[in-house]
Amino acid sequence: KIVSKAEGNIVDLGQIEPSILAKEFATQYDKDPRLVEVVLRESRRVVRMDRGILVVETKHGFICANAGVDASNVPGDERVSLLPVDPDLSARRIRSDLKDSLGLTLGVIISDTFGRPWRMGNTDIAIGVAGINPLLDYTGQTDINGYTLRVSVSAIADEIASAAELVAGKLTQIPVAIAKGYPHVEYEEATARSLVRDGSMDLFR
């Protein structure tokens, strides 16, 4: 949220003219048609519209509810925040600024709160990364019993993002958390899009 605010990704619902589709969905489920319209505009495609919930694929390729459009922690009753336009670029800029000002080579993760299919509750995941490979591949390594791991890839950026949320919290007004001790922070090809499963590998699309 802090990155979206800093980059001005805030929308005034008073300036939004809802489409026919937005009005129909809003009427059926007692939603604000302007908010629905913003969600549709931030979406590449609608995955599911049911029970008052909009599950979409965002322009970034993320599958989530409401395209990440959020009214929480945004001043004003008529304003909502959007996801950063390019979270990876935002992370790279922050990383570069930190290196220039502090002389430190750091990894940067921009996170947001997502729900999870078949699991109750939300958790933070990485939507933008810089300097850190978001996936940690153990394939080919052996476990303590000598078994060679064939398919074992950890979403390390998501794990760090989720751990950081325990520190930052939802109501504490702490926008940044520092994770120390992770050694791999010089991966220049980092992108959070590598965390998105390709459609050809997805059994549920």
Regions found by a protein language model. Give the residues of each.
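N-terminal low-complexity or amphipathic/hydrophobic leaders
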Residues: K1-A22
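Phosphate-interacting basic helix/loop segments used at nucleotide- and nucleic-acid interfaces
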Residues: L82-L106
